[in-house]
């Protein structure tokens, strides 16, 4: 919560700050709050009406599907199977760097993810640069 909301939400703080203002200013603030609250209520009402309209349309379309002999669940499974067949795994990235690990084995690294400790230490100690490890 930001500072303004903390102040507005605390009655004691409001009382302290209200002592510094005239009654006319407080009444102006009240009127502005009423306007904002009414606008917010209208927005909320509009959103609820849109949700209700959408529910009515969904019910209507469901009844139309059933009248045509189509099970709505069957329709959902058909669309889900299309989406899953469109998904493809991305190919494995080729290695860009090679290095010898602590056990003396040759290893490769794609350049993605954490830098292997052998490469990282060599760069930090300024013994080598990253380009020295290129394949």
Swiss-Prot record:
Q: Which gene encodes it?
A: hns
Q: Which residues bind DNA?
A: 112-117
Query: What is the annotated quaternary arrangement, including any partners?
Result: Homodimer that oligomerizes on DNA into higher-order complexes that form bridges between disparate regions of DNA compacting it.
Coarsely, its chief localization is: cytoplasm
Q: PANTHER family, per this entry?
A: DNA-BINDING PROTEIN STPA, PTHR38097
Residues of the signal peptide: none
Q: What is this protein called?
A: DNA-binding protein H-NS homolog
Q: Which domain of life is it from?
A: Bacteria
Q: What is the lineage of its organism?
A: Bacteria, Pseudomonadati, Pseudomonadota, Gammaproteobacteria, Enterobacterales
Q: Which organism is it from?
A: Buchnera aphidicola subsp. Acyrthosiphon pisum (strain APS) (Acyrthosiphon pisum symbiotic bacterium)
Q: Does the record carry Cytoplasm as a key word?
A: yes
UniProt keyword terms in alphabetical order = Cytoplasm, DNA-binding, Repressor, Transcription, Transcription regulation
CC annotations in GO: cytosol; nucleoid; protein-DNA complex
Provide any one GO MF term from the record.
protein dimerization activity
Please give the Gene3D superfamilies that the UniProt record associates with this protein. Answer: H-NS histone-like proteins, Histone-like protein H-NS, C-terminal domain
A Pfam family that this protein carries is Histone_HNS
Which InterPro entries does this chain map to?
Answer: H-NS-like_N, H-NS_C_dom, H-NS_C_dom_sf, Histone_HNS, Histone_HNS_N
Q: Where in the cell is it found?
A: Cytoplasm, Nucleoid
């Amino acid at each position: 919560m930001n500072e303004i909301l903390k102040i507005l939400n605390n009655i004691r703080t409001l009382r302290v700050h209200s002592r510094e203002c005239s009654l006319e200013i407080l009444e102006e603030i009240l009127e502005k709050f009423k306007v904002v609250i009414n606008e917010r209520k209208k927005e909320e009402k509009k959103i609820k009406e849109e949700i209700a309209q959408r529910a009515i349309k969904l019910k209507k379309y469901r009844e139309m599907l059933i009248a045509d002999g189509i099970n709505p669940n069957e329709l959902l499974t058909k669309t889900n199977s299309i989406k899953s067949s469109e998904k493809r795994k991305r190919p494995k990235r080729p290695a860009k760097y090679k290095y010898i690990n602590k056990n003396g084995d040759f290893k490769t690294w794609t350049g993605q993810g954490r830098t292997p400790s052998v490469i990282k230490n060599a760069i930090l100690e300024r013994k080598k640069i990253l380009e020295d490890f290129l394949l």
